[in-house]
Amino acid sequence: MTRSQKEKMLAGEMYNAADPEIQAELLLTGAWLKRYNDTLGDSAERWNGLLLERLGAVGLGAVIRPPFHCDYGFNIRIGAWVYINYNCVILDVAAVTIGDGTAIGPAVQIYTADHPHDPEQRQAGLQLGRPVSIGRHAWIGGGAIILPGVTIGDHAVIGAGSVVTRDVPAGSTAMGNPARVKAGGRLPKS
């Protein structure tokens, strides 16, 4: 049996992004995002109700401040008491998991979308995704970019503006471009 392009995408395999089923999902998400982003002045309860319509999972007390942008939504799972500030972009062609109590600053970008290195495959419209996982009680500073395939451990801190290209261990602090784990692991207590 031949698998659909959407099934290939969800399995992390190479898929054709121009496939009609995938394009239809993007249109559905675009319409949902318009509704969601039009609620800027509304309550967190209203936001939560809309999030439950499209996201894969939404924990108790989770907040995503509009405007928010994603590819599909159904690949995003956010835990309880997660806070995501304005202008977050999540390219969720693969799973994005955000653990309980995590705080994400404004304009953070989380990418699961990747492309083949072979130019002929790219020209043919082929793509693939690699999942991103952010642990519990992590803090992602504003403007950080998290690249495909990265895992950020529980209680980790990512400095503002950092570009995270590799895994960050639990309890550590990483910053810079590319992000590097700081010696001593944690920011000093103030």
From Swiss-Prot:
PROSITE patterns assigned to the protein according to its UniProt record, in alphabetical order: HEXAPEP_TRANSFERASES
What EC identifiers does the entry list?
2.3.1.-
A GO molecular function assigned to this protein is: acetyltransferase activity
Q: Which domain of life is it from?
A: Bacteria
**What does UniProt give as GO cellular component?**
cytosol
What UniProt keywords are attached to this protein's entry?
Acyltransferase, Nodulation, Plasmid, Repeat, Transferase
User: Which SUPFAM superfamilies does the record cross-reference, listed alphabetically?
Assistant: Trimeric LpxA-like enzymes
Q: Matching InterPro entries, A to Z?
A: Hexapep (IPR001451), Hexapep_transf_CS (IPR018357), Hexapeptide_acetyltransf (IPR051159), Mac_dom (IPR024688), Trimer_LpxA-like_sf (IPR011004)
The family this protein is said to belong to: Belongs to the transferase hexapeptide repeat family.
Function field: Acetyltransferase implicated in the O-acetylation of Nod factors.
| Name the UniProt record assigns to this protein | Nodulation protein L
Organism per entry: Rhizobium leguminosarum bv. viciae
